[in-house]
Amino acid sequence: MGRGRHDTLAPVNHPAGARELAGGSSVSLVANASSAEVVAVKDGEASTPNAETACPEYTPTPLFAFDVQGARVTVWPAQPSGNARNRAGEGGEEDDDGDANRYTRDNHIGGSCGRDGIDCDNRIGDDGNCLNHIVYLHVYDGDGLDVLSECQRIGCPPFTLVAIKPACWNDDLTPWKCPGLFADDVPFAGRAQDQLRLLEEEIIPQVERECGKPNSPRICRTVAGYSLAGLFATWTALNSSAFSRIASASGSLWYPDFAHFATETPLACPIDCAYFSLGSKEAKTPSRLLRNVATGTDEVVAAFRSKGVPTQFESNPGNHFKEPALRMARGITWAISQQATNR
């Protein structure tokens, strides 16, 4: 593991709203002024039938960031809707390139703060529907902008992203000790319980205290992650009442005894939905442990369905390292788009 194999996964970072095409052409993402549709701009020309109505490009700016017990936490505002982008792009003396970002900083959550606690009832509005979403995403490296950019590109509903880079990826996200994947790899320390405590007692209260507004609608929390962070997200649903949704993309569900644990352990709290995905070639590996990932994922998916959780499984082409940000974005998009069932 400590040598760049499988779970030592570095995210694919793309500049916000920009991609490089073959031949050096640039593609930027803009919002269609008549809808929330995202369209491509190649070499300065919008590829949309009504290019003159396109809005200025939206580039997210973090709300704030902080360090806690070796973890780095970066909080991104909810993406503005098409109407918000339009308002930000309208002419006027006060308009400038930062209007879209300022709009989201002023209206980032509209949700509750840490004073309300983090139990099961702190996730839905009076009508039983989620009104504001916060996604807590553990990342191997970076600040989560690559995933946020993909979410915007594929039309994900607005949400506040909390990207958490743990102090030690291999140790902090694993539920119990396990030998390394290969003979010369360092064992996994199994400190997920400590990371969950940090999340519940330090990170969530601080984030929602900074973002929250008194007497505003309640929020839905999703815990999400790729690879070992996907394992952690799945394990969290069985150990914490803080979250109503999980999104595990290419999760390390090969982890020894985890599928059995997921089958035999009741949910810590009823949850609205669970998302799992796996690459079609992920089980094709020299590692004996990693070869169990497909079987383990199937068993975990079946376990969540048997608990009455609306569960989605998606198979993606390729191995563990293909398009991780896009895979994670697809999971987040599905999870926060579902109807609240935990009434």
Predicted regions and their residues:
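Conserved hydrolase catalytic core segment
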Residues: 235-244
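Gly/Ala-rich beta-loop-alpha elbow adjacent to hydrolase catalytic centers
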Residues: 224-229, 233
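Alpha/beta-hydrolase fold nucleophile elbow
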Residues: 213-225
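Alpha-helical scaffolding within the catalytic cores
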Residues: 149, 231-232, 256-269
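A domain-start/cap signature at the N-terminus of enzymes
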Residues: 2-89, 93-97, 101-106, 110-132, ...
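C-terminal catalytic histidine-bearing segment of alpha/beta-hydrolase fold enzymes
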Residues: 277-280, 294-301, 305-343
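Active-site nucleophile loop of the alpha/beta-hydrolase fold
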Residues: 166, 247-255, 281
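Serine-hydrolase catalytic machinery in alpha/beta-hydrolase-like enzymes
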Residues: 133-198, 202-213
